[in-house]
């Protein structure tokens, strides 16, 4: 009911959602209970004045210090956060501590001159010299990493085996770790959101961040860049804790404890501090505080997407969008992923079987919920949906606030330790992949009229389908209808209907056809055959038209046979009885001529629109 209300009246929906949030305050999302404002207030009173993930209640949740080669700090910052979450959850599947492959991300992120699937010329970033957390997120959410392989590690802080030469992009020996959620936080100009960041560090582990590293901002391994400084961030690191009483160059105390990637012989055994009041750390919207959460061994065999480069822009003012996909094999849809561009977003996911004449049809699944924080999210389907090879399907996403994140050709604005600025990374799109709702009409995003012509024809929404192999289960044709008509005028056009249904296993596909019908009269069926009818579609109606026999005051009987094409032994019979009246519709020669013409030219009925 809520989904229908949302689509029919957005204004009323906003009022209803506000009322729901104020009344209930608790909304279940993916197995968690998200407390709105009440939760944040409660957490604030319980947070310690200092915290260190290396000594959290007697446990260490930080992997060892690395020594980066080249401009790969961004890869080390992201992997430190991924590894930290794995240590907290215990989801790492190999012996020892997690040691993920920074240089696989460095080579195969898809934004650089070595590899960009969207650009055959491979223009873009220079390998080993640039990236950020949006780049790493695009790579993770495609399911290409994070890679764990013993071959990537040499037991030293440098872990350099894969730096000089690119490793294989895919290898069956790799373990791939996937962050189900990635969240971006901003502490705020008055640190009004700092407790959220602290709570996430305590519950989700190490968090990625960035700063403008410079001797002018560093004093005894304590960093502080004033807010009025114009320098952009140039180095990525990771937050592992804090101290509210740590004195810094800022007017007020308080600092983040930072894990660097310059070896353990730098700083305080590889660590240092950044003031709470730093310009970028905890403040930059894309690099300030990034939490990689619910990291697990990738459990999906395929990830369908059109947004190769992930979240590059947001289409404001649009709430409804969908992506179209075609199953490459027999697969079941187990999860959907997407980004939200603001906090506290109510979403609705729907899966459709068809997009016909500008309308999404045959809804197979729906789910609603609330996403508490900005970022990337993976939503499991309680009941997987099976699709046969070649079957098209459509993932609809309604986002109440913030607009729809999308990929497009873009200039990388935050280019850490890069040799040059203003690098353009090309994306590509095709017509028929992404659609957005404009008024009451679905429009192909491929033709969106961007002001910048270089963006046109390159944009796709960040909506992904996560699938596994599926063994199609048996479909079963069912029909219990009959056609029984009385007092039918001879040689008259008769209209009737019956319905069929697939009562087989969930999400099985029924392919059917009408193979037999009575040999009296002239018959047409709309449609006469069909495919991919699922149990979830419910009854499917078939329209029947026939020219009644010319003989008066007679009862005619016959059968309509519908067959399951994939299992001919599964068929249904619709019994037909027609009793003609004593009165003719026409008489004499005209009647006989009409009958003969109808029999000789079956399309005559359609031509006459009878």
Where are each of the predicted segments found?
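A short beta-strand micro-motif common to beta-rich folds, especially ectodomain repeats
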Residues: 554-566
């Amino acid at each position: 009911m809520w989904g229908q209300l949302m689509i029919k009246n957005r204004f009323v929906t906003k009022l209803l959602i506000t009322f729901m949030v104020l009344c209930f305050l608790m909304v279940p999302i993916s197995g968690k209970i998200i407390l709105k404002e009440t939760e944040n207030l409660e957490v604030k009173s319980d947070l310690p004045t200092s915290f260190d993930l290396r000594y959290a209640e007697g446990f260490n949740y930080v992997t060892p210090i690395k020594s980066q080669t080249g401009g790969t700090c961004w890869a080390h910052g992201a992997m430190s956060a991924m590894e930290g979450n794995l240590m907290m959850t215990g989801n790492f599947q190999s012996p020892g501590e997690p040691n993920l492959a920074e240089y696989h991300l460095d080579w195969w992120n898809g934004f650089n001159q070595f590899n960009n699937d969207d650009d055959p010329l491979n223009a873009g970033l220079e390998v080993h010299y640039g990236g950020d957390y949006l780049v790493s997120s695009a790579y993770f959410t495609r399911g290409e990493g994070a890679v764990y392989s013993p071959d990537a590690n040499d037991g030293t802080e440098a872990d350099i085996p894969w730096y000089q030469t690119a490793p294989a992009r895919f290898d069956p020996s790799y373990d791939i770790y996937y962050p189900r959620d990635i969240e971006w936080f901003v502490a705020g100009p008055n640190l009004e959101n700092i407790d959220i960041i602290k709570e996430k560090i305590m519950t989700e582990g190490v968090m990625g961040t960035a700063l403008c590293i410079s001797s002018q901002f560093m004093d005894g391994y304590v960093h502080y860049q004033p807010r009025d400084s114009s320098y952009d961030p140039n180095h990525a690191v990771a937050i592992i804790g804090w101290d509210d009483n740590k004195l810094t160059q800022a007017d007020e105390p308080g600092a983040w404890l930072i894990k660097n990637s310059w070896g353990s012989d730098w700083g305080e055994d590889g660590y240092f501090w950044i003031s709470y009041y730093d310009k970028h750390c905890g403040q930059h919207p894309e690099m300030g505080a990034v939490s990689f959460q619910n990291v697990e061994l990738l459990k999906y065999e395929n990830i369908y997407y059109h947004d190769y480069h992930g979240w590059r822009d947001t289409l404001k003012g649009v709430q409804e969008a969908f992506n179209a996909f075609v199953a490459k094999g027999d697969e079941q849809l187990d999860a959907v992923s997407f980004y939200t561009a603001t906090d506290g977003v109510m979403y609705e996911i729907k899966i459709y079987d068809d997009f016909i004449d500008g309308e999404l049809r045959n809804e197979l699944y729906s789910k609603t919920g609330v996403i508490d924080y900005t970022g990337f999210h993976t939503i499991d389907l309680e009941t997987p949906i099976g699709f046969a090879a070649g079957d098209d399907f459509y993932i609809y996403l309604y986002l109440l606030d913030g607009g729809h994140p999308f990929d497009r050709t873009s200039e990388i604005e935050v280019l850490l330790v890069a040799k040059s600025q203003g690098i353009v990374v090309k994306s590509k799109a095709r017509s028929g992949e992404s659609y957005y709702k404009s008024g009451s009409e679905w429009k192909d995003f491929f033709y969106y009229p961007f002001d910048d012509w270089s963006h046109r024809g390159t944009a796709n929404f960040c909506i992904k389908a996560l699938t596994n192999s599926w063994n199609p289960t048996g479909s079963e044709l069912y029909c219990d209808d009959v056609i029984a008509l009385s007092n039918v005028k001879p040689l008259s056009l008769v209209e009737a209907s019956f319905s069929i249904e697939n009562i087989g296993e969930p999400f099985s596909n029924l392919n059917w056809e009408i193979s037999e019908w009575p040999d009296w009269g002239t018959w047409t069926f709309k449609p006469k055959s069909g495919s991919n009818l699922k149990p979830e579609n419910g009854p499917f109606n078939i329209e029947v038209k026939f020219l009644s026999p010319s003989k008066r005051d007679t009862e005619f009987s016959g059968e309509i046979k519908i067959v399951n094409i994939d299992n001919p032994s599964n068929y249904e019979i619709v019994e037909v009885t027609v009793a003609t009246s004593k009165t003719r519709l026409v008489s004499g020669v005209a009647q006989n001529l009409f009958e003969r013409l109808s029999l000789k030219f079956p399309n005559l009925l359609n031509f006459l629109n009878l």
